[in-house]
Amino acid sequence: MTDKPSKTQTSFLRRLLVAYLIDTGKNTVPLIIEATGMPRRTAQDTIKALHEIEIKVEQFNRGEYRISDWGAVNRNWIKNNFTHVCSVLSYPYKME
């Protein structure tokens, strides 16, 4: 039996994914959109919401972001579960 993921789960996983993408060089809204296909507003709102899960993101240069602190989040979990996260979110992204 496969259950549809809850909005809470997808919101949390989307935040983890966006933080991971920023940390691995997909650090602008256009690059995140290109990688995932998510709408621009979703990408922007997700970046703005990262602080809610204690991930600190900084904007530098023009429109570029970087993660300055992962807080309690284990970055390696996202790396190791990348395919699962993309699958739950229905994002086609593949690591290069």
Stretch-by-stretch model annotation:
Residues 23-28:
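Short capping segments at the starts of secondary-structure elements
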Residues 1-3, 7, 68-96:
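Long, low-complexity, charge-rich intrinsically disordered regions
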Residues 11-18:
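Short, leucine-enriched amphipathic alpha-helices that occur as contiguous helical runs
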Residues 51-60:
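A short, conserved structural fragment
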Residues 59-66, 70:
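Short, Lys/Arg-rich nucleic-acid/phosphate-binding segment
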Residues 31-35, 51-52:
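Alpha-helical residues within the helix-turn-helix
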